[in-house]
Amino acid sequence: MASSSNEKEINYLADETNVRILGRTYFHNNILWMIYLSSGIEFNISANKLYISIKGDSAANVESSEGQISLARIIVNVNGERKLDELILHQDQTFKIFDEQNIIEGVVQVIKISEVAHSIAGIKSITVNSNGKISPTQPKQHRIEFIGDSITCGYGIEDLNPLNKFTTKTEDCTKAYAYKTATALNADFNLVSISGWGVISGFTPDPNVKNEIKLIPKYYIKLGFCNNSFEGKCVQDIDWNFEKFVPDVIVINLGTNDNSYCNGDKTKIEEFVNEYTKFLNVVKDKNPNAYIFCSLGIMGDQLYSGIENAVKKYKEANKVENISLVHFDTQLEEDGIAANKHPSEKTNEKAAKKLIEEIKNKMKW
């Protein structure tokens, strides 16, 4: 429903009456909070004017983006063309998307393209002229969930200098393999990915020191994990409702960060295999009808044999066949290396091509 109106404009809430919800989000106090990457809204529009009002999280209180590495980054696409690309600096910001003499018709998409751990942002309202209209778009043909780390996030993908470090300014999930795969397959999708996270250990510079905080399995059943709060709430304290998104396919791309800890140690690798198998059981429990693809390789495939063993154990224990492996090619310097030695968009295009073929083959899409 519309939240308010007058002679000149109508303000709509970002709820399911007016828009289609994308990704893991949370509606609270009439604000739709965009949690993981690529979460947000999509809607049909017929209007002369469009403004989007955004609410920042607890860290959105800066005068400039200079020196900031964790600000939420949002984009607005109109008929597939990026019309807005902004970092959220303040608690309340309103952005003009267009204000024209002629009516604009088509599809609008508002999504967050930076990752949850660093920041989230909320959609307060969608404003159009008094005779403007919006409505939810139709769901896509298929549904995919991607579970991963920085590679899935599009970490540093806009910065082709491998010596540079992380900032949300150069992170863009729309240029990474997961987004490209889902788009090519006409699929709605959820991204459950955080940079530096793993199965038994997040990234660690010292293989003798286990990073037990940054574990995807620990927070998979939660809304997410964020260092900031929103309206006095913490993302990691809220359970995710798995009925909100029921995927046909789940792609898991974890193990790159675990390798920094395992470092070829057989005992550690055995622990990785066991915990990966346990996580597969959790994923199956929450998504009983999904086909699972377990992948690795873009930034190294040292734990690929461990994932093979985990999949074998999972299949034997559950007497199922709806799971398979995808061995990605390791990135090449000639394709460009992005910030902090992460894959370029060209590398992601190659990975997407391979994954698309695998999914089409198994799912007959």
Regions found by a protein language model. Name each.
Residues 1-147, 151-173:
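N-terminal secretory targeting modules
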Residues 36, 163-266, 298-308, 342:
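Conserved SGNH/GDSL esterase-like catalytic core that processes O-acyl groups on lipids
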Residues 139, 245, 284-287:
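Short, conserved loop/helix-junction motifs that constitute active-site signature segments
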Residues 143-147, 152, 189-193, 248-253, ...:
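Structural recognition of the beta-strand scaffold that forms the well-ordered cores
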Residues 178-188, 282-291, 314-320:
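A structural motif corresponding to the C-terminal end of an alpha-helix
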Residues 272, 276, 348:
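Aromatic/hydrophobic pocket-lining residues that form the small-molecule binding cavity
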Residues 298-365:
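Catalytic His-Asp segment of secreted/periplasmic serine-dependent ester chemistry enzymes
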